[in-house]
């Protein structure tokens, strides 16, 4: 008798994706982040669902409802902080996952990579709208500043912003629609993640060498199931350490002040995971230019496969490219730091230099380094 998992229409899909899937024998812990992102997404959907049971998306009661969740709802505080810090863990995993893709040349799987970029945009949109929901000072002003950027679009800008706001400022209508979008987007992300996986399983996973691993495959279960479980346990450990010992470490104190349209906070800044993009936005003195740079800072990932000039796929055996890659990582950390600093000397010039470096590294130095390496190897 054939095993039910190989014959049942539904079980067959699960089997081919998570049990009998042929996987490379040498994939390192950098390949754990895909499954960790899945764990993060499930965790965010579950905690978010329970928060939505008690949250009210009305400007007069939103802030109070979040306070009510933390004070009066059974274990409401832990659900709220798991959701808030879960977003940080989500983005840590996302950045690691994208970094892994860049380093090991996984972007040559074009469909998988492009859907990944769409997933990144969708996750950033979800996180932004979620940050608005508690209706604190930083929620309100963050929403005002970021939505206002769309007014830089020529001709239709102002109308577009007022259409998104549902009025002439960020108000009741804005909060309600942001809640609706924040609720629906994670399910769209889950669907896109399945498509992401579908395209990945068309080609099979890449591996650290970048060389085809068709001659050396092992079954996903039990080897990588146990590895993923270990990764998930470590992720949950890190998350719970954050939640139970330093729940407000990554948050902004200004968000504990209810939203007040008449009082602007001294420093408007987003959550830490958007600071690199925020620094790029601020480094350009022109509004439209800043918005374009902001969008391009993420959209540039779509260009990476076309900029791949190396004869090798992975950076494992390419020391010059490795140097460029780690300089890029350092540059992104610099941008993250600058994004959280006030707009004054010397931060302005550092931000501008780091922004120029960011685009220069990806568009020029990466392909140049690859070409140099090809020539050194006489390829």
Swiss-Prot record:
Cofactor names: heme b
Protein's cellular compartments: Mitochondrion inner membrane
SUPFAM superfamilies the UniProt entry points to: a domain/subunit of cytochrome bc1 complex (Ubiquinol-cytochrome c reductase) (SSF81648), Transmembrane di-heme cytochromes (SSF81342)
Annotated binding of heme b b562, by residue: 83, 182
Biological processes, Gene Ontology terms: mitochondrial electron transport, ubiquinol to cytochrome c
Keyword set, alphabetical order: Electron transport, Heme, Iron, Membrane, Metal-binding, Mitochondrion, Mitochondrion inner membrane, Respiratory chain, Transmembrane, Transmembrane helix, Transport, Ubiquinone
Molecular function (Gene Ontology), one example: metal ion binding
Residues annotated as binding heme b b566: 97, 196
Chief localization: mitochondrion
Oligomer and partners: The cytochrome bc1 complex contains 11 subunits: 3 respiratory subunits (MT-CYB, CYC1 and UQCRFS1), 2 core proteins (UQCRC1 and UQCRC2) and 6 low-molecular weight proteins (UQCRH/QCR6, UQCRB/QCR7, UQCRQ/QCR8, UQCR10/QCR9, UQCR11/QCR10 and a cleavage product of UQCRFS1). This cytochrome bc1 complex then forms a dimer.
Its biological purpose: Component of the ubiquinol-cytochrome c reductase complex (complex III or cytochrome b-c1 complex) that is part of the mitochondrial respiratory chain. The b-c1 complex mediates electron transfer from ubiquinol to cytochrome c. Contributes to the generation of a proton gradient across the mitochondrial membrane that is then used for ATP synthesis.
Miscellaneous: Heme 1 (or BL or b562) is low-potential and absorbs at about 562 nm, and heme 2 (or BH or b566) is high-potential and absorbs at about 566 nm.
Name of the protein: Cytochrome b
The species this protein was found in: Oryx gazella (Gemsbok)
């Amino acid at each position: 008798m054939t095993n039910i998992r190989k014959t049942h229409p539904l079980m067959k899909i699960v089997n081919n994706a998570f049990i009998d899937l042929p996987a490379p024998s040498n994939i390192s812990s950098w390949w754990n982040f895909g499954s960790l992102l899945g764990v993060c997404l499930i965790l965010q959907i579950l905690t978010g669902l329970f928060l939505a049971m008690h949250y009210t998306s009305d400007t007069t009661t939103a802030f109070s409802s979040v306070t009510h969740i933390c004070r009066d709802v059974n274990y409401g505080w832990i659900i709220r902080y798991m959701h808030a810090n879960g977003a940080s863990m989500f983005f840590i995993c996302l950045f690691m996952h994208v970094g892994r893709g860049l380093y090991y040349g996984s972007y040559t799987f074009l469909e998988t990579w492009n859907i990944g970029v769409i997933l990144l945009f969708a996750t950033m949109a979800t996180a932004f709208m979620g940050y608005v929901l508690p209706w604190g000072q930083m929620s309100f002003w963050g929403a005002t500043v970021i939505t206002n950027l769309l007014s830089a679009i020529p001709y239709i800008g102002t109308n577009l912003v007022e259409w998104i706001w549902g009025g002439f400022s960020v108000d009741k209508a804005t909060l309600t629609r942001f809640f609706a979008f924040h609720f629906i987007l994670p399910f769209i992300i889950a669907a896109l993640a399945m498509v992401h996986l579908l395209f990945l399983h068309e080609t099979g996973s890449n591996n650290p060498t970048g060389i085809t691993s068709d001659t050396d495959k092992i079954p996903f279960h039990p080897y990588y199931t146990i590895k993923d479980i270990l990764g998930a346990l470590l992720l949950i450990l890190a998350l719970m350490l954050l939640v139970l010992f330093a729940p407000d470490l990554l948050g902004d104190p200004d968000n504990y002040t209810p939203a007040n349209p008449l009082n602007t906070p001294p420093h408007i800044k987003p959550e830490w995971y958007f600071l690199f993009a925020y620094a790029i936005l601020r480094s350009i003195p022109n509004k439209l230019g800043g918005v374009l740079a902001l969008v391009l800072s993420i959209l540039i990932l779509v260009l990476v496969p076309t900029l791949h000039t190396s004869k090798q796929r992975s950076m494992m055996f390419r020391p010059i490219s490795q140097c460029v890659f780690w300089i890029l990582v350092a540059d992104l950390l610099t941008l993250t730091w600058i994004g959280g600093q006030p707009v004054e000397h010397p931060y302005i010039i550092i931000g501008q230099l780091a922004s120029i470096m960011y685009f220069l590294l990806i568009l020029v130095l990466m392909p140049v380094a690859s070409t140099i390496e090809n020539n050194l190897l006489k390829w």
